[in-house]
């Protein structure tokens, strides 16, 4: 085969369809028309003489051939993107882009502070932050769409051999109450008192919820007996609900600095129980690590917690 039956732009279109779930959304994300997307897909299928999408479904569903093409096409695109970034680093070590991922709470309350420190010292480096679930962020690092990420949960089991995971710092979770609650006058309550509270919590599948339930159960507190009155989708919503007197909750200490200073919320300890989770830095063993990424890890993360960030093992023999 002398001429390739597809271009890099066409591979980008196929990847966008897979990520966005439809031709229309893919077109919007790429700033092109939907007919243009359909035309490119039709041309590839014509060149390959094979169907890439199952059109009997409402959403864009890849056929087996489409999945195979995207498997290798994704690698091609990632390698091209790495090549461009490597050349950019070679041209100017202090220039470039840094794309960081973070899970919800970490991305909302911790990362802006760290990125602020980094930008003060390296204002010429562009930093992008993407905040999603731990699972989605882990896959983005594995696919080369992120340079690194900081997460508060475990990476998917299928990615453990692909991702390098290094513990960063402990994040303490604390019980919060409205100032009007009777327990707010105490600095510490007994674990049995938790059964008397009404709780506002994140979804059961959230990382923080799983950590809290696991630690409470380990300390003799049956999390299934806690009265969960309401489940909300964000920490901000939970804080507002607690401030309004609707119940109590567990949140990261990093999320309530302002509320504690303004006395909008009270933090109450539980006797002999500390609820902590480990935040981890994840990178991809096999991906090129940009100068900006190494600088962020060494000078920002390493500086804050005295953690020297190690490079991935060499593949040279």
Swiss-Prot record:
Cellular localisation: Plastid, Chloroplast
Superkingdom as given in the UniProt entry: Eukaryota
Record bears the keyword DNA-binding: yes
Entry keywords, A to Z: Chloroplast, DNA-binding, Plastid, Transcription, Transcription regulation
Cited InterPro entries: LysR_subst-bd, Tscrpt_reg_HTH_LysR, WH-like_DNA-bd_sf, WH_DNA-bd_sf
Keyword field contains Transcription regulation: yes
GO molecular function, one term: DNA-binding transcription factor activity
Species for this entry: Cyanidium caldarium (Red alga)
Gene: rbcR
Main location: plastid
Protein name: Probable RuBisCO transcriptional regulator
Primary role: Trans-acting transcriptional regulator of RuBisCO genes (rbcL and rbcS) expression.
Protein family per UniProt: Belongs to the LysR transcriptional regulatory family.
């Amino acid at each position: 085969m002398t001429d390739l039956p597809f271009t890099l732009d066409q591979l980008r279109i196929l990847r966008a369809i897979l990520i966005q779930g439809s031709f229309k959304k893919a077109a919007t994300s790429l700033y092109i028309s939907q007919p243009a997307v359909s035309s490119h897909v039709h041309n590839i299928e014509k060149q390959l003489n094979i169907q890439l999408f199952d059109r009997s479904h409402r959403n864009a569903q890849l056929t087996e051939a489409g999945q195979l093409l995207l498997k290798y096409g994704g690698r091609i695109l990632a390698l091209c993107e790495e090549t461009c970034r490597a050349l950019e680093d070679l041209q100017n070590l202090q220039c470039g882009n840094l794309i960081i991922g973070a899970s919800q709470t970490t991305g909302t309350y911790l990362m802006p502070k760290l990125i602020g420190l980094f930008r003060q010292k390296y204002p010429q480096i562009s930093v992008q932050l993407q905040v999603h679930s731990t699972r989605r962020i882990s896959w983005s690092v594995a696919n080369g769409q992120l340079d690194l990420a900081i997460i508060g949960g475990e990476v998917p089991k299928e990615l453990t051999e692909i991702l390098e995971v290094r513990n960063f710092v402990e994040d303490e979770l604390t019980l919060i109450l409205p100032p009007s609650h009777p327990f707010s006058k105490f600095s510490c309550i007994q674990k049995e008192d938790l059964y008397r509270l009404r709780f506002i919590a994140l979804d059961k599948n959230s990382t923080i919820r799983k950590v809290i339930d696991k630690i409470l159960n380990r300390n003799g507190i049956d999390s299934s007996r806690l009265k969960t009155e309401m489940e909300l989708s964000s920490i901000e919503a939970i804080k507002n609900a607690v401030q309004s007197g609707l119940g109590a909750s567990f949140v990261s200490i990093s999320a309530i600095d302002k509320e504690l200073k303004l006395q909008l919320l009270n933090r109450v300890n539980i006797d002999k129980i500390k609820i902590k989770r480990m935040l981890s830095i994840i990178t991809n063993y096999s991906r090129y690590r940009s100068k900006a990424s190494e600088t962020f890890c060494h000078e920002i993360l390493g500086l804050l917690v005295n953690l020297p960030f190690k490079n991935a093992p060499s593949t040279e023999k």
